[in-house]
Amino acid sequence: MHDSVTVHMAAPPERVWELVSDVTRIGRYSPETFEAVWIEPATGPAVGAQFRGHVKRNEKGPIYWTTCTVTACEPGQTFEFGVGNKPGAPLNVWRYDIVAAGDGSDVTESFTLTPTFGLRLYWAVLGWSRGKTNHNGMRTTLERVRDDAEGREATTQ
């Protein structure tokens, strides 16, 4: 229960990291998470910082808030967060890895689901559909980040 997408961006790793680690920008990039806010006292990315993401599942609904905790934060390299209210026991983990490559950066977005019984059952029945949605959503997110990082207007739907 893991997938990833990599997109090359003609921008330095520091610029890309600045964009993906600023969760308040997520509404510009993600097809599902349309806003996010830092939970006080957090005001920016740091391990242990928490934020709330406002999600519209499958771009149709249901609409809900989820709590996220930053679990890895290396400027210019990595931004990772766990989703779920239990610190240390996330439902899933989303991660951005940024590597300098040629004229810019190769950026990989990935997710890993915690293999609970309920999630295993869900993925056995509907996982093919949700997996495709996640894969396409990661590609869309990275393409929109690329547009911003390269100085073009990010295209939103």
Regions found by a protein language model. Name each.
Residues 82-140, 145-147, 156:
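Beta-strand/loop substructures that line and gate deep hydrophobic ligand-binding cavities in soluble
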Residues 13-14, 43-45, 71-77, 97-106, ...:
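A short, structured loop/turn motif at beta-sheet edges
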Residues 15-20, 26, 51-53, 70, ...:
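Hydrophobic pocket/interface hotspot
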Residues 57-64, 115-118:
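Short, cysteine-centered beta-strand-loop-beta hairpins and adjacent loop/turn segments enriched
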Residues 49-58, 80-86:
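Short beta-strand segments that buttress and anchor functional surface loops
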Residues 1-6, 14, 50, 65, ...:
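Intrinsic-disorder/low-complexity, polar/charged segments enriched in Ser/Thr/Lys/Arg/Asp/Glu/Gln
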Residues 5-7, 39, 65-72, 92-100, ...:
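Hydrophobic/aromatic beta-strand elements that line small-molecule binding cavities or substrate pockets
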Residues 1-43, 47:
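Hydrophobic ligand-binding cavity/cleft-lining segments
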